[in-house]
């Protein structure tokens, strides 16, 4: 079946970071043996930044890292990285704190924004890379995006001074927001917090148990998070919080309830990912007027992570039918969808929405399109091929794109 949808807005991406990564090697689509052969053939005289590493496909032992050329290998989830032994001296000269703390997973999960800044600095970002990345999204069905963690002030300046500014909404970490002048603060939609890790790095704040290694990791103690919300509630801006596991979701809701009761005010409040939200938490979020910003493409975690998640967690992932049918969240109003760039485009998200691992994860195409919303600053149409036999959706074409005046 072929159908046409509008060019869409991705409500959760990391545009400047992925633009910087465009000059880096990407092994996300490589078979493990091919990826390892590629890594072994990289230059010995400089540090190679490699993205798209999937630890469940290509585990990295200390012996393997000791034999590789100078590389930093960044997890596909963006949470977690490893550095080869020969790469450590290169990292020490450029980002010494990241180098010294590289093996401390708790520190890494608590410092995602500065690590993103380090990645951006290592890979390099300029207007050309930014434009090329955003243009590459058009044939994939995406015309605009929320940039969910602008890594540096310099990156904000590159984005906001580009012709693509009207197609981007900016979110920044609290520490970066406080460094900004009034003019730059006026450019951003709000502050973005990270409350837990990720399934890909075995650090999402789920109660568990995990299969094999895994630990619920929190960025903030409860009192520290509440203090941040109290302070941020006077900024007059929006609030977004990454919370994957049910324990992180609970921490977020409890802190927001107290902060709002005490007078904190935000233009909007978003919880990102919320893959393991339960019905009671969903009702509390609804009562607070919170927007759930979710990733239909993460439905495939229920297939990809059978090595670390129990059957109950595989099934609980992305409970869209409960959220929509039981609690009353409405795609496009208080439920938004985005890709997190994992992968880019609408095809994979549509595949997971229409052909999920569990019926509780299913979204209709109308719900998916509403949750993404139409592109900002640009318009066009996207032709989708929906193959019910192969259970796959692909983009077969896009119309001529028209830029907004």
Residue ranges and their predicted role:
Residues 9-11, 145-146, 166-172, 189-195, ...:
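Hydrophobic faces of well-ordered beta-strands that scaffold small-molecule active sites
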Residues 57-59, 280, 345:
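Residues that form or flank phosphate/diphosphate-binding pockets in enzymes
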Residues 81-84, 177-181, 302-307, 347:
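Short, charged, surface-exposed secondary-structure boundary motifs
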């Amino acid at each position: 079946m072929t159908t046409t949808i509008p060019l869409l807005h991705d409500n959760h991406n990391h545009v400047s970071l992925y633009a910087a990564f465009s000059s880096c090697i990407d092994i996300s689509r490589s078979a493990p043996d091919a990826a390892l052969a590629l890594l072994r053939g990289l230059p010995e005289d400089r540090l190679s930044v490699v993205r798209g590493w999937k630890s469940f496909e290509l585990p990295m032992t200390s012996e393997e890292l000791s034999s590789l050329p100078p590389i930093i290998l960044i997890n596909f989830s963006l949470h977690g990285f490893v550095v080869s032994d020969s790469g450590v001296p290169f990292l020490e000269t450029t980002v010494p704190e990241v180098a010294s703390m590289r093996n401390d997973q708790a520190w890494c999960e608590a410092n995602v924004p500065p690590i993103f800044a380090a990645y951006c600095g290592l890979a390099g970002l300029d207007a050309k890379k930014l434009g090329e990345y955003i243009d590459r999204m058009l044939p994939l069905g995406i015309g605009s995006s929320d940039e969910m963690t602008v890594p540096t002030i310099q990156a904000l300046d590159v984005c906001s001074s580009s012709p693509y500014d009207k197609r981007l909404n900016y979110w920044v970490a609290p520490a970066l927001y406080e460094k900004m002048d009034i003019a730059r603060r006026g450019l951003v939609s709000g502050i973005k917090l990270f409350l837990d890790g990720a399934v890909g790095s075995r650090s999402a704040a789920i109660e568990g148990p995990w299969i094999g290694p895994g630990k619920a990791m929190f960025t903030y103690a409860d009192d520290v998070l509440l203090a941040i919300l109290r302070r941020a509630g006077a900024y007059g801006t929006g609030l977004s919080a990454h919370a994957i596991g049910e324990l992180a979701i609970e921490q977020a809701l409890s802190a927001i309830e107290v902060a709002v009761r005490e007078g904190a005010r935000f233009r909007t409040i978003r919880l990102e990912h919320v893959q393991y939200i339960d019905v009671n938490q969903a009702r509390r979020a609804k009562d607070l007027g919170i927007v759930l910003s979710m990733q239909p493409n993460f439905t495939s975690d229920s297939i990809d992570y059978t090595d670390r998640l129990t059957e109950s967690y595989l099934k609980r992932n992305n409970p869209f039918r409960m959220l929509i049918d039981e609690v009353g969240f409405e795609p496009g109003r208080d439920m938004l969808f985005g890709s997190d760039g994992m992968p880019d485009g609408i095809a994979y998200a549509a595949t997971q929405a229409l052909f999920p691992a569990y019926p509780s994860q299913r979204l209709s195409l109308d719900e998916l399109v509403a949750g993404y919303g139409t592109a900002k600053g640009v318009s066009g149409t996207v032709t989708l091929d929906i193959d019910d036999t192969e259970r796959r959706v692909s983009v077969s074409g896009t119309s001529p794109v028209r830029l907004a005046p």
